Amino acid sequence: MHKLACPKCHESIVQEGNSYKCANNHCYDLAKTKYLNLLLNPDKATNNPGDSKESLVARKAYLTKGYYDVILKSVIDCIKKYRDDTPLDILDLGCGEGYYTRGLKEIFSLDTIYGLDISKEAINMATKYTKDVYWLVGNSKNLPIVDHSLDFITALFTVINQDELKRTLKKGGYIIHVTANPNHLIEIKELIYDEIKVKSDKYIRLDFETIESYDLVHQVKIDNREDALNLLKMTPHYYHIKKERRGVLDELERLDITIDIKITIYQTSID
């Protein structure tokens, strides 16, 4: 049984044909591609929130080549380590075009997986991977999930709202938080910027019990121009390139990059 909730009243919603309804008769229609739009207009900052189509297409093309599989495997290993034998409800928060979500479903095929992103374009792309995931357009500040119903929330390089994590996770539920360390994709920063500004991670730490935290460093060799440009386009750095530096892209034939991330597992209180 899914744990979907109405974003207006947070009551459970049930499927009736091609729609989902709550007890207060709020109704949401399934899209033709089988995703559910649970994003309310007040939750939108723009008419088309989220990443651009160019960025999403580049992201899908790059990730499906397996360059970031080491990250997916690490998240999967974390879930395997901390799960029990009961069926799980797992939300992939800010799932984008669905690559990691699809990977979770392939491994945890008997569990219920949700992929949520604020971008309708991203979720529509995600449905092409599989229809066995609950693909949701929604806002991390107003998760369309019933209270205290999730076993795991995965959050990879995405904005989160701690109050919503507390509300939707079960007692003893887990958050797998993946964040970029200062040297993540350092080669791209050196390519684009005259000066690299190192950001502190002091605001990234969440207000939950830390169960485990470790750094993952991995070298990746990209030996063709197309994949290198796709990596650039899926990062915000590409859109910050100064005009006088754009010439470096014309000469880009290959790229060696460093994956340098922090994986932190948090747990909510069991009391």
Regions found by a protein language model. Name each.
Residues 97-109:
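Conserved SAM-binding loop of SAM-dependent methyltransferases across substrates and taxa
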Residues 1-48:
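N-terminal auxiliary segments of SAM/dcSAM-dependent transferases
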Residues 45, 50-74:
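Class I SAM-dependent methyltransferase Rossmann-like catalytic core
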Residues 117-121:
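Conserved SAM/SAH-binding beta-strand->alpha-helix loop
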Residues 141-152:
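A short acidic, Gly/Pro-enriched loop at the edge of an enzyme's catalytic core
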Residues 172-182:
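Conserved beta-strand signature within the Rossmann-like core of class I S-adenosyl-L-methionine
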Residues 86-96:
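Conserved class I S-adenosyl-L-methionine
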Residues 217-271:
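Conserved Class I S-adenosyl-L-methionine
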